[in-house]
């Protein structure tokens, strides 16, 4: 029924010539209509507050509370812990995020439930903050409606949260508004006071009744900050990237709506590629209207996401010409995330043309449409360059190539610190356990950057003892030795200081496991042996190529992902022959790991996207 409300309201919203949006919302209220009319009557002599009430009621369809015995049981657990109000309110929102708990809850539409007294109280409290807070003196009425007035931020249970501001925070805000000229006229500066208070409510990391709780996690921290900001009279919103275009996952954060500064906070997307940035709003935004039994992806059945990509990125519009089945009314752009194609934007068909607006640059997009619930490829994927030019990636089966691949996921600079720590280490060999007159084998002079380092060794000499020696405590994934026939040799591990940890992991042929070496580590082979090759690998993400792992290469055409065959790696790179050129590729590891990214080939090398 809730989805019905969303589509019905959006459809009616687009037909304002027949009836006003307010009248349509009141029709949906059913038996609750007198309560909402009572609010309008209450403000009949206050035009501004009446406009605010109309805004809330007009956009109320589609907003709802999730409730049920499961959530009430969860609340009893939280109530027994003596958690501060604001933290408790956000903790109670976490089960609403997960399908396994959501399916146990029932939606209660606001339009049928919200009472006059509650709505009047919320409106009066919001206006009190707007008219008495010096930092809001230049806040526009439209921004007030969207970013301060709303009585909810998600699907939480409704209460009188504006009345529950922490007394210490309230006193800090009053002090600043009375005395601190550099703060009291700036929403952003006042928000720093609230931010510090919200951060002080650190719950740590925990798991309550199977629900993960972490104040460091972006969704939790955004909800916590947004409630704290609006409670204190700071206009704010949550912006989010539903899925990254160059890595797995998503992100969301809180933005301050400041009358002087741009309403974005830096440091959220600059180091990543975002196809779209959306803002959670109370008011409804355009969404695809299905015709007959047309399938609409779930993200775009929610009208409360506003496209704000232009606030963050230099964007481009993209027009695609392609024929689709006559019953198809909408097409979509998808990106590769989490080993699947995920929808990020939509367009309505107009004479076999689809126009997508404000798209993020330097991204590979996959145009798709739906037949029933089945996703189909509209045309070939393309690269949207920063200059707005699109480059179609149509596989060329007449020009084939040989690919030598070394990774399945891009190497990020912030993950190679374990390799940096290795610089300065030395490897030595000796037949004396004290390493008197030891033979110098290798110096670590550069960061291996998660790649294995293969060190050839003089096979005419034999040594019983091998030593890793360093001034630092480091973490290694592998330390391997091979004889002149390429066979692995194993010895006894000696930890001179006795402060190492998980040292057996260095010799388990698992690149994802690792051990901590405290300055020195010795391997005793029991007798002098001939070593032809020594290999070491810093702690890493296991996204390289590793001997014994099975890999499969795919390329993308109009029929989807096409396999180019499976291979077992025999070294730290893998070769695939007779590969179509000018395609999007995907290398999968069927043995281990989850992180995988698509790539193209530029100048003979992998370019990850």
Please place each PLM-identified region on the residue numbering.
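C-terminal motif of bacterial Sec signal peptides marking the signal peptidase cleavage site
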Residues: 13-14
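Secondary-structure boundary elements
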Residues: 27, 37-38, 46-213, 248
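Extracellular beta-sheet/turn segments enriched in Thr/Pro/Gly and aliphatic residues
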Residues: 301-311, 379-405, 605-609
């Amino acid at each position: 029924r809730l989805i019905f409300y969303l589509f019905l309201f959006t459809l009616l919203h687009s037909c304002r010539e027949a009836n006003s949006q307010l009248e349509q919302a009141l029709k949906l209220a059913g038996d609750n209509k007198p309560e909402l009319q009572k609010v309008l009557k209450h403000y009949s002599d206050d035009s501004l507050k009446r406009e605010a009430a109309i805004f809330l009621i007009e956009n109320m369809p589609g907003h709802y509370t999730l409730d049920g015995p499961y959530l009430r049981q969860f609340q009893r657990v939280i109530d027994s812990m003596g958690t501060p109000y604001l933290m408790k309110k956000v903790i109670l929102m976490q089960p609403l995020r997960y399908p396994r708990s959501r399916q146990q809850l029932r939606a209660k539409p606001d339009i049928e439930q919200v009472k006059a007294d509650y709505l009047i109280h919320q409106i009066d409290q919001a206006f009190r903050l707007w008219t008495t807070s010096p930092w809001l003196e230049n806040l526009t009425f439209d921004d007030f409606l969207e970013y301060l007035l709303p009585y909810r931020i998600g699907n939480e249970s409704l209460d009188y949260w504006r009345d529950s501001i922490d007394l210490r925070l309230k006193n800090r805000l009053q002090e600043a508004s009375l005395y601190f000229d550099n703060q009291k006229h700036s929403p952003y500066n006042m928000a720093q006071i609230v931010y510090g208070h919200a951060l002080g409510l650190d719950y740590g990391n925990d798991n309550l009744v199977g629900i993960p709780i972490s104040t460091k996690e972006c969704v939790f921290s955004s909800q916590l900050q947004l409630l704290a900001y609006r409670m204190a009279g700071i206009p704010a919103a949550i912006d989010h990237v539903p899925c990254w275009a160059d890595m797995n996952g998503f992100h969301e954060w809180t933005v301050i709506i400041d009358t002087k500064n741009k309403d974005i906070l830096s440091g959220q997307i600059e180091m990543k590629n975002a196809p779209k940035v959306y803002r959670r709003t109370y008011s409804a935004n355009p969404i695809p209207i299905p015709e007959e039994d047309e399938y609409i992806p779930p993200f775009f059945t929610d009208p409360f996401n506003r496209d704000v990509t232009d606030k963050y990125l230099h964007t481009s519009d993209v027009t695609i010409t392609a024929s689709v089945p006559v019953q198809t009314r909408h097409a979509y752009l998808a990106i590769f995330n989490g080993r699947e194609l995920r929808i990020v934007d939509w367009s309505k068909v107009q004479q076999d043309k689809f126009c997508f607006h404000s798209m993020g640059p330097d991204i590979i997009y996959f145009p798709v449409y739906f037949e029933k619930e089945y996703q189909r490829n509209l045309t070939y994927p393309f690269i949207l360059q920063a200059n707005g030019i699109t480059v179609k990636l149509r596989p060329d089966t007449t020009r084939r190539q040989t690919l030598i691949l070394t990774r399945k996921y891009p190497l990020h600079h912030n993950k190679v610190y374990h390799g940096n720590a290795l610089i300065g280490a030395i490897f030595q060999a000796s037949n004396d356990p004290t390493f008197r007159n030891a033979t110098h084998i290798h110096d670590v002079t550069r960061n291996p950057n998660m790649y294995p380092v293969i060190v050839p060794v003089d096979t005419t000499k034999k040594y019983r003892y091998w030593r890793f020696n360093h001034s630092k405590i480091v973490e290694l994934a592998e330390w391997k030795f091979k004889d002149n026939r390429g066979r692995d040799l194993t010895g006894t591990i000696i930890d001179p200081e006795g402060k190492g940890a998980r040292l057996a992991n260095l010799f388990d042929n698992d690149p994802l496991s690792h051990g901590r070496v405290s300055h020195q580590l010795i391997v005793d082979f029991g007798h002098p042996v001939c070593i032809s090759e020594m290999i070491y690998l810093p702690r890493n993400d296991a996204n390289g190529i590793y001997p014994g792992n099975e890999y499969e290469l795919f390329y993308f055409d109009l029929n989807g992902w096409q396999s180019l065959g499976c291979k077992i790696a025999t070294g730290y790179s893998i070769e695939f022959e007779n590969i179509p050129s000018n395609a999007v590729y995907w290398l999968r590891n069927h043995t281990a790991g989850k992180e995988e990214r698509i790539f193209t080939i530029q100048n003979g090398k992998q370019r990850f996207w």
